[in-house]
């Protein structure tokens, strides 16, 4: 990752998370103690980031209602996390229109679970952001769709490009191999308490109507943790694989641009693609 992206990320981080990010710059460093960083301060930051207009989860509690006794609720949640008593409630599944008569299922967590997801995403982001490649633009601090388009446009006008391959991974978040994802995560995270917490967020039931179902794969769309987990997964199976193993074997220039589960690869000629 380039230094300007890390600087953008660091501007909104607590001093302790900055320390995590600094250690994470060493690719061989493994974190043995991270869970204690999900404290009341981290939970409150996650609360402040919540959109107050978002729908409530299965428990019917809104952000405004949860915030009426915020200090007490955060202290209680932190105690449950510290003692290992926190359990992720089933995620409410709703289907939203996608166009052409199709729908896309998303999951809505209760406020308390959103705070845990948000705190985990903030902490794991400090661990993995230094590792991510410049080709990745989705759901990263200081980067977005316009940055991806600008970078692609620069290559199209400044480099010899004769062929473009567009990739859209169908049902990506629903099809992620959880076992492989956790193996990727544990390469950097040795903290068993944090591992258990991530596991609780992955292996969670889905509430549809009055029934709760469980799946063996995927991460829930709508969870604030899912974009980061998706980036970790695709960093390994696409970004690193293509740039380190595939691109060096090709003749001519090739570039990868990825925004979440959508990607574009440019080639100097169709024959070399």
Question: Can you say where each PLM-predicted feature lies in the sequence?
Answer:
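Charged boundary/loop elements
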Residues: 7-64, 122-135
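Acidic, proline/serine/threonine- and glycine-rich low-complexity intrinsically disordered segments
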Residues: 5-6, 271
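Duplex nucleic acid-engaging cores and interfaces of nucleic-acid transaction enzymes
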Residues: 111-112, 116-121, 145, 163
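Conserved phosphate-binding loops in nucleotide/dinucleotide-binding enzymes
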Residues: 105-110
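Short alpha-helical scaffolding segments that buttress acidic/His motifs in well-ordered protein cores
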Residues: 46-50, 119, 197-202
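Short, small-residue-biased leader/transition segments that mark boundaries at the very start
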Residues: 1-3
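Phosphate/adenylate-binding "loop-and-lid" substructures adjacent to NTP/NAD/dNTP-binding pockets
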Residues: 44-53, 58-103
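Conserved polymerase palm-domain catalytic core
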Residues: 73, 80-95, 99, 131-273
